[in-house]
Amino acid sequence: MQSTAVGQGSIDPIQTVDLIADKQLTEKQEYCHNLITFKESSNNRHAVNGSHYGYYQGRSKALKGAPDDYQFYWYWSYVSHRYGVTRYDEPNYCKALHHLQVKGWQ
């Protein structure tokens, strides 16, 4: 498995996204973020489904093969603009998850 250097050691790519989420999100939003990531790509940063790419299956060719942090912040921006932010100024991943569930996509 490919690893990404972080600090003095190296970790698996999905751990990079998990670490970013852990530092940037409240526990509730991190939980919803992680459910979305697993459902969308099974935590596979190279996942492809038609014209959708990466952890979050975004419809942007820029995500194809993009580094973990780029994918994370791309989705951060997408969710913030589409579903709003919480009172802690973080993307509302739980609102995004609810939308996916209502549509039957989760």
Regions inferred by a protein language model and the residue ranges of each:
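N-terminal prepro-regions of secreted/extracellular proteins
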Residues: M1-I11
